[in-house]
């Protein structure tokens, strides 16, 4: 019971102190507003400096991943393999799909593939003469369904290839640059050595970051269903691993896969790690913004000290009367520092709310096929900003508070 009574007394005393602090803030509202603005600018600058480093780096890496693959991506060339053996190719595809890492294969063909949009595939023989005149100038990429795991390929509409082994269908995906050519749900393709037309379903549009019209074909479906189009010259393996294995281990694993399936020669092309080249530039920019934010907060400290001392000159008589009627030195320090901390807490809440809604608002305005994923709020930087704001408030109010605590009650009689 005594503890409860003591707790209630402490609570009542805390509310009384808070009430005094709020009344104290009403004495000079303009001064407190200017102090809050200076703190607000410093906190926003600190959060912005972290955002530039994190979001800026994420944006650059995401854009580069559209062209060069997620970092790091290793490339290997395959030549001299038995690409025409259906059984061996099926085993090869099966092993590639079951790899624990992200592995995709692109194939270069001996013959050029031409593609044309059609309104319907029900009567190709009747429209074959006109179809050849509608062929569009596009790059054709034969690849596996895991290609969009290696490269950052957000979908503008539709879907990517189905990686299921069951019910393989002939489908293609076009990029945004080729979208104007393929305004229908169907397309046909053929090779130079044949007049037969092969129908495809246009299943999606992808943002691959290039201005060159490109069509992506499911290589596994072509190998299964269109043997006259499956005339492979060589292949390239793209390997992205997050497990930290070395290039030599990848080479050894791929070499074993080839030995067990289609055979051939394996050569290392190289490593795509272009995203890391931006680290130094972003680090310098982030450091500059951090220094700027700390300078702004330092100026805020000086401003608070100056305002606190000038306010102390105006409130000397009031504080002396408080001392004369029984206020302790600790009460005076609490009153002066409490005002600064109250402003700091309020500014922190406002700053974090504004910056949070700005970050979330930026994500809402991103297009569906944006290479950058949903933006994440930098919680760590917000915590650092709050701690820094409290420290700034304490430093800014400490000198005026200590000076106010040294006032002698006898001076109130003057």
How should these model regions be labeled?
Residues 78-83, 133-134, 205-209, 238-245:
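Structural beta->alpha junctions
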Residues 1-45, 414:
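N-terminal Sec/SRP start-transfer signal
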Residues 394-414:
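Hydrophobic alpha-helical transmembrane segments of membrane transport and translocation systems
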Residues 30-41, 46, 294-303, 309-311, ...:
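Transmembrane alpha-helical interface segments in multi-pass membrane proteins
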Residues 278-296, 380:
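N-terminal membrane-entry
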Residues 131-232:
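Hydrophobic secondary-structure segments that place a key small or acidic residue at a functional site
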Residues 50-147, 253:
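Membrane-proximal extracellular/periplasmic loop immediately following the first transmembrane helix
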Residues 235-286:
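A cross-kingdom feature of multi-pass membrane systems that activates on extracytoplasmic/periplasmic
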């Amino acid at each position: 019971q005594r503890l409860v009574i003591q707790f209630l007394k402490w609570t009542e005393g805390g509310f009384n102190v808070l009430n005094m602090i709020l009344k104290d803030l009403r004495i000079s509202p303009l001064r407190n507003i200017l102090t809050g603005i200076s703190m607000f600018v410093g906190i926003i600058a600190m959060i912005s400096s972290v955002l530039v480093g994190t979001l800026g780096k994420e944006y650059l890496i995401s854009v580069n991943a559209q062209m060069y693959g997620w970092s790091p991506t290793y490339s290997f060339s395959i030549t001299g393999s038995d690409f025409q053996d259906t059984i061996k190719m099926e085993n090869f595809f099966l092993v590639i799909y079951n790899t624990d890492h992200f592995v995709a294969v692109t194939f270069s063909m001996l013959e050029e593939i031409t593609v044309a949009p059609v309104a319907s595939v029900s009567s190709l023989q009747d429209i074959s003469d006109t179809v050849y005149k509608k062929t569009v100038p596009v790059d054709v990429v034969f690849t596996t369904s895991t290609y969009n795991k290696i490269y950052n390929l957000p979908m503008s509409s539709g879907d990517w290839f189905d990686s299921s082994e069951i019910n393989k269908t002939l489908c293609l995906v076009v990029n945004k640059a080729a979208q104007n050519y393929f305004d229908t749900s169907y397309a046909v393709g053929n090779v130079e050595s044949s007049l037969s037309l092969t129908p495809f379903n246009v299943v999606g549009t992808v943002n691959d970051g290039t201005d060159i019209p490109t069509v992506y074909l499911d290589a596994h479906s072509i190998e299964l269903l269109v043997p006259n189009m499956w005339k492979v010259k060589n292949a390239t393996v793209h390997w992205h691993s997050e497990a930290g294995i070395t290039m030599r281990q990848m080479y050894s694993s791929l070499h074993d896969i080839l030995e067990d399936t289609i055979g051939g020669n394996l050569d290392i092309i190289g490593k795509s790690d272009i995203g890391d080249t931006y680290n130094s530039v972003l680090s310098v920019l982030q450091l500059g913004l951090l220094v700027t934010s700390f300078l702004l907060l330092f100026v805020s400290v000086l401003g608070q000290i100056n305002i606190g001392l000038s306010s102390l000159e105006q409130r000397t008589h009031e504080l002396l009367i408080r001392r004369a009627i029984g206020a302790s030195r600790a009460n005076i320090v609490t009153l002066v520092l409490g005002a600064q901390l109250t402003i700091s807490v309020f500014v922190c809440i406002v700053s974090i709310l504004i910056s949070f809604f700005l970050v979330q608002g930026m994500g809402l305005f991103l297009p569906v096929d944006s290479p950058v994923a949903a933006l994440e709020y930098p919680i760590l930087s917000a915590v650092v900003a709050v701690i820094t704001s409290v420290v700034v408030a304490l430093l800014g109010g400490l000198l005026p508070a200590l000076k106010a605590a040294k006032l002698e009650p006898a001076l109130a009689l003057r």
